[in-house]
């Protein structure tokens, strides 16, 4: 029975809710069925054993979560303020990520990786972001984007060449955005011209996260402009390749320890064996990877919101005004309760999207919902925390202002909040 249930869960198709116009709405309301469940799945789960709550973790997940929390508090927290001020990540922090196995979470153990689950990556990103969003981002890019792309689309030779290094020593970055190709990423102008057994890449990319520390760049370039966006191809480019230049890091509002740089390509010669997947399929890989990566950003923003909340509540339970603890004023209690409820909703959305991905089930809508809600909430809750703490919350002597600055990027990268709403609306339209 359990095996059959697993097969149904993994193979279930998205239920299209096309109700006949003659059907009375009171008999079968549209909301009666979850958009991510098929009828077979519903039957299988209704008669089977009770399903575990979303916040039930395996022993491995609990162990990873606990270890990362300890690492973040002991090896990241002491450097957070300095890294933010200097706009530079401490080498010891990056080395620690590799030593702890946090840069190759899903990479198979035969390549030197941890061999854990995608959900484990989500837990790691969340725990790191509670302490520092920049460190969480480095881990997020490596695990939810680069490692997964090479694992899914790479040849055995590419996996053997890059995955061991990505798991143990080499940070990475993905190059998609350009000056005129942000949300409209398929409008990219970077080109890749075939010359014998090589491709020559020319162009420039903008807003490239982790560019300053990356030893490997996954680059999207158009190999056939006559085919439009279907000419976009994905290349694996080593950081020391001649003609690849990383520019000066941007002076950003938040996530300052994470380098965000322009990257230019001047006659960069890449062997055709470094094409990831198939020529002209880069746009598919980009869409698929970003859909998955959005769950990572949701986890990051969830961590930012939770970290700020965890710091603020003890403060307002101690500080007194008018002879009472600030926390004891009903007006503030209502605000705290509202934020705590929204925080729990963001966590459930994020965990659900991650579990759906692991089960091989449709999760595009759920990933966008998680990213949208967690990102918007992070901005709101960090703003509220500053207000709750009063004047000290507005100073750099306390970390809540940094959480506030770090939160803003969540509504921008890997698809703005408006792009997420577009995606969610398209999915809803397809369901009815």
From Swiss-Prot:
Metabolic or biological pathway, per its Swiss-Prot or TrEMBL entry: Lipid metabolism; mitochondrial fatty acid beta-oxidation; Amino-acid degradation; L-isoleucine degradation
Similarity comment text for this entry: Belongs to the acyl-CoA dehydrogenase family.
Cofactor dependence: FAD
GO BP annotation list: fatty acid metabolic process; isoleucine catabolic process
Gene3D superfamilies reported for this sequence: Acyl-CoA dehydrogenase/oxidase, N-terminal domain, Butyryl-CoA Dehydrogenase, subunit A, domain 2, Butyryl-CoA Dehydrogenase, subunit A, domain 3
PTM sites of type N6-succinyllysine: 70, 284
Organelle transit peptide: 1-33
EC number(s) from the headed UniProt entry: 1.3.8.5
Quaternary structure annotation from Swiss-Prot or TrEMBL: Homotetramer.
Purpose of the protein: Among the different mitochondrial acyl-CoA dehydrogenases, acts specifically on short and branched chain acyl-CoA derivatives such as (S)-2-methylbutyryl-CoA as well as short straight chain acyl-CoAs such as butyryl-CoA. Plays an important role in the metabolism of L-isoleucine by catalyzing the dehydrogenation of 2-methylbutyryl-CoA, one of the steps of the L-isoleucine catabolic pathway.
Protein name per the record: Short/branched chain specific acyl-CoA dehydrogenase, mitochondrial
Catalyses which reaction(s): 2-methylbutanoyl-CoA + oxidized [electron-transfer flavoprotein] + H(+) = (2E)-2-methylbut-2-enoyl-CoA + reduced [electron-transfer flavoprotein]; (2S)-2-methylbutanoyl-CoA + oxidized [electron-transfer flavoprotein] + H(+) = (2E)-2-methylbut-2-enoyl-CoA + reduced [electron-transfer flavoprotein]; (2R)-2-methylbutanoyl-CoA + oxidized [electron-transfer flavoprotein] + H(+) = ethylacryloyl-CoA + reduced [electron-transfer flavoprotein]; butanoyl-CoA + oxidized [electron-transfer flavoprotein] + H(+) = (2E)-butenoyl-CoA + reduced [electron-transfer flavoprotein]
Principal subcellular localisation of the protein: mitochondrion
């Amino acid at each position: 029975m359990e095996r059959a249930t697993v097969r149904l869960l993994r193979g279930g198709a998205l239920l299209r809710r096309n109700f006949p116009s003659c059907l009375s709405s009171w008999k079968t309301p549209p909301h009666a069925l979850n958009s991510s469940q098929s009828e077979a799945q519903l039957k299988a789960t209704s008669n089977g054993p009770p399903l575990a709550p979303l916040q039930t973790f395996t022993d491995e997940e609990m162990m990873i979560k606990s270890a990362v929390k300890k690492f973040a508090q002991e090896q990241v927290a002491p450097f957070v303020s300095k890294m933010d001020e200097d706009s530079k990540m401490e080498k010891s922090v990056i080395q620690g990520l590799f030593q702890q196995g946090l840069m190759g979470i899903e990479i198979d153990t035969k390549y030197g990786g941890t061999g854990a689950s995608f959900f484990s990556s989500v837990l790691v990103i969340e725990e790191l972001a509670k302490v520092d969003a920049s460190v969480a981002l480095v881990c997020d890019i490596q695990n939810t984007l680069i490692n997964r792309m090479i694992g899914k689309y790479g040849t055995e030779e590419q996996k053997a060449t890059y995955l061991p290094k990505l798991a143990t020593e080499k940070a990475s970055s993905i190059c998609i955005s350009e000056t005129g190709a942000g949300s409209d990423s398929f409008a990219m102008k970077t080109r890749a011209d075939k010359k014998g057994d090589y491709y020559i890449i020319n162009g420039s990319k903008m807003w490239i996260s982790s560019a300053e520390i990356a030893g490997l760049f996954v680059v999207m370039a158009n190999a056939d402009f006559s085919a439009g966006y279907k000419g976009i191809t994905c290349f694996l480019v080593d950081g020391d390749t001649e003609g690849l230049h990383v520019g000066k890091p941007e002076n950003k509002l938040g996530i300052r320890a994470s380098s965000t740089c322009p990257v230019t390509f001047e006659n960069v010669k890449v062997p055709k064996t470094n094409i990831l997947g198939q020529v002209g399929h880069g746009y598919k890989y980009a869409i698929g990877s970003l859909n998955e990566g959005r769950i990572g950003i949701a986890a990051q923003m969830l961590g930012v919101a939770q970290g700020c909340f965890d710091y603020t509540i003890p403060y307002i339970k101690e500080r007194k005004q008018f002879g009472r603890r600030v926390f004891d004023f009903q007006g503030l209690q209502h605000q705290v309760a509202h934020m705590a409820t929204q925080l729990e909703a963001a966590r459930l959305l994020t965990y659900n999207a991650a579990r759906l991905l692991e089960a091989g089930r449709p999760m595009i809508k759920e990933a966008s919902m998680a990213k949208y809600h967690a990102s918007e909430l992070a901005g709101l809750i960090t703003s509220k925390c500053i207000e709750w703490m009063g004047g000290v919350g507005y100073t750099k002597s306390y970390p809540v202002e940094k959480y506030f600055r770090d939160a803003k990027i969540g509504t921008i990268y890997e698809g703005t909040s408006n792009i997420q709403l577009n995606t969610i609306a398209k999915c809803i339209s397809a369901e009815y």
